[in-house]
Each structure stands twice: as structure tokens, then as C-alpha cells.
């Protein structure tokens, strides 16, 4: 009985230690969500405007540019999977990896080989464990991405995309770049504090659309200089970098929101466990005291009877 009581008290101490960790993680995630959400909101207008500008440029010229034109018989599709560097964020990574696997299956059904690029240690570990080839990976900034991080990733993706037009083989070309005919980004879209959804978006060839309140306001008119082809060559890296940066910011906000929710649930569960264990320990202690009193009374009665 004494051993059982010691075991219960040990479990209470362990649960209390875990609760301190989860509560601290919850508070840290809570403090980061507001900043991450503000960065997402600040980046959206720029991403929308550069998309609008490219849409207008495409509509104003009959340009046969790789960013706009679907390639005949595409063979490979580059897929950037954005995950987290750390765990303790619930189903965040599982959802984005599941969405990536769904995209891989869809691409293979269309006769396209996925070429994998990864952001975050969790996705890198997942694909490495399954012996899947990762062309390039970036880690260490999933919670606080910068535009420089996005531009570094975009440079790699743009080089692969532009090399796709001349790359006819199944291996890397003479320049060491494995060309791709499409670019996709799989990330977690931040919709609200309680809603984050893993999505897959095609970044190139560009799906031409006008982003904005077309029905309620006038459409912006642009005057372009120099020629459209030069503009597209200059804007392509910036467009891809903007798409990547927006995805990184959405993913960072989603990661913090998922971690806060997971840690709050873990803290609440630790509270419930501590209460249950404390109740069990009190009952065990009460039973122990009752038994000791019974033994004392029994001993006293035995002594009285012997007299």
C-alpha cells in the first residue's frame, strides 16, 4: 500500500512537470500568433498586386512565356512541401504530409514524376525515412521565415522551372539542374485561430486570375515598359519568391496556432490527470490511515482481553 502511494505521488510530480512544459509552450505560441497573423495580412496585398500585374501583362500581350504557357507533355513537377522544424503542434505536419502524398498520387496519375523540395525538419525526416529523394531542403526558420529565405528557395525553383524547357532527359542536365515543367507548393493555409487547412497550390505555369474586388471597384490600368518578355523574365523570380514567402508566412502562423491548440489541450489533460491521481492518492492515504487505526484498535483490544 505504501509503495502504491509513492507511485501515485511520483506520477503526480511527473504530470506536474509535463504541465509546466506544455503551459510554457502554449504561452510562447500565443505570443507569436498575433505577430505571425499580422505578417500574413501584410503580405497578402503585395502578393495579390503582383498577381494582378502579371495577369494584366499577360492579357495585354500574346506572349509565349514559360510562366504562362502549359508545356506539352510535361514530365516532371516540382513540389515544395512546407512543414515545421519542431513538433508539439498536433496534427499540423501529418495533415500537410497527407496533402503532399495526395498531390504526388495525382501527379503520377497524370504521368508526371514529382520532384521533391522540402522546408522543415519534420518533412525532411518523413521523406528521408521512406528513402524518397529530396532534391533540396531548407530548415531552421519555419516559425520565423524571412523574405531572404523565400528568395533563396525561389531561386532554386525558378532555375529548375526554366531548365525544364530544354531538359529532355530523366536526370539532371549538364548544368546539374533537374528541370521541371510545373511548380506546386504544399503548405498550411491560415484561415483563423481555429481553422488551418493543408492546401496545394500551383505556382507555375501561372493560373491567370485577377485578385481583388472586381465587382465593387474599378480595375487598375497598367502601362508597361519595357517589352513584355523582358518584364516577365524580371518578374518571374519575384513572383515565385512572393508565392513562396506567402506560403511560408501562412505556414508559420498555422504552426503557432496548431501548437497553441495542442499545448492547451495537453495542459488541460494534465490538469485532469493530476486531479484524478490526487483523488486516488487521497483515497489510498485514507485507506492506509484506516488500516493503521484498525490495527491499533485491534492490538489494544487484544491487550485488554489478555488482562
Curated annotation (Swiss-Prot):
Bilayer topology annotation: Peripheral membrane protein
Keyword Transport (UniProt): yes
CDD domains: F1-ATPase_gamma
GO process terms (BP): proton motive force-driven plasma membrane ATP synthesis
Compartment annotation: Cell membrane
Major location (coarse): membrane
Pfam family membership, one: ATP-synt
A molecular-function term among this protein's GO annotations: proton-transporting ATP synthase activity, rotational mechanism
Entries under InterPro entries matching the protein: ATP_synth_F1_ATPase_gsu, ATP_synth_F1_gsu, ATP_synth_F1_gsu_CS
Gene Ontology terms: cellular component: plasma membrane; proton-transporting ATP synthase complex
Keywords tagged on the record: ATP synthesis, Cell membrane, CF(1), Hydrogen ion transport, Ion transport, Membrane, Transport
Function as written in the Swiss-Prot or TrEMBL entry: Produces ATP from ADP in the presence of a proton gradient across the membrane. The gamma chain is believed to be important in regulating ATPase activity and the flow of protons through the CF(0) complex.
Family, as annotated: Belongs to the ATPase gamma chain family.
Self-association state and partner proteins as the record states: F-type ATPases have 2 components, CF(1) - the catalytic core - and CF(0) - the membrane proton channel. CF(1) has five subunits: alpha(3), beta(3), gamma(1), delta(1), epsilon(1). CF(0) has three main subunits: a, b and c.
This protein's name: ATP synthase gamma chain
The gene coding this protein: atpG
